């Protein structure tokens, strides 16, 4: 069977959330369904899934703010790792971003995720010195820090 890369459809939600859980991408304070709802309101064409035989086997969210592009939630089903699914998803996200005029794409990887770091290295992504910071404005679930005010 071949892998199809296409835009996320609402019927994909349960499968995508399960995929993110399997891949260890979810956190208790970050409701994945809320992330999906928010993404569908902003550049939904940059939310992609990989499908084989009617089943979702991969996903990636991308975004472009006019300055930089970002990749989020890249995940591949364990049964499909090492088969080019993640590479195909990144390539399509990059193609769409470039078509929008995006000059550079960035992403964040947890420091202990050596597998992801090696994957992105192989795709030509280079680490750079920066201090990544964040400020939570909305808490989606229990266990997270309260919103900063």
Where are each of the predicted segments found?
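Conserved acetyl-CoA-binding loop-helix of GNAT-fold acetyltransferases
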Residues: 82-95, 118, 122
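A short, acidic/glycine-rich surface segment
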Residues: 58, 115-119
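Acetyl-CoA-dependent GNAT
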Residues: 3, 7-73, 77, 90-92, ...
């Amino acid at each position: 069977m071949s892998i199809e890369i296409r835009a996320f459809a609402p019927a994909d939600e349960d499968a995508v959330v399960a995929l993110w859980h399997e891949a260890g991408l979810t956190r208790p304070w970050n409701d994945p369904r809320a992330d999906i709802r928010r993404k569908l309101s902003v550049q939904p064409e940059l939310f992609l899934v990989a499908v084989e035989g009617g089943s979702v086997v991969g996903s990636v969210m991308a975004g472009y703010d006019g300055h930089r592009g970002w990749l989020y939630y890249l995940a591949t089903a364990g049964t499909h790792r090492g088969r080019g699914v993640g590479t195909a998803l990144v390539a399509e996200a990059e193609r769409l971003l470039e078509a929008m005029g995006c000059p550079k794409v960035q992403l964040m990887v947890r420091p202990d995720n050596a597998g992801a770091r090696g994957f992105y290295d192989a795709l030509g992504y280079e680490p750079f010195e920066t201090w990544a910071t964040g400020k939570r404005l909305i808490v989606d679930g229990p266990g997270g820090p309260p919103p900063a005010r």
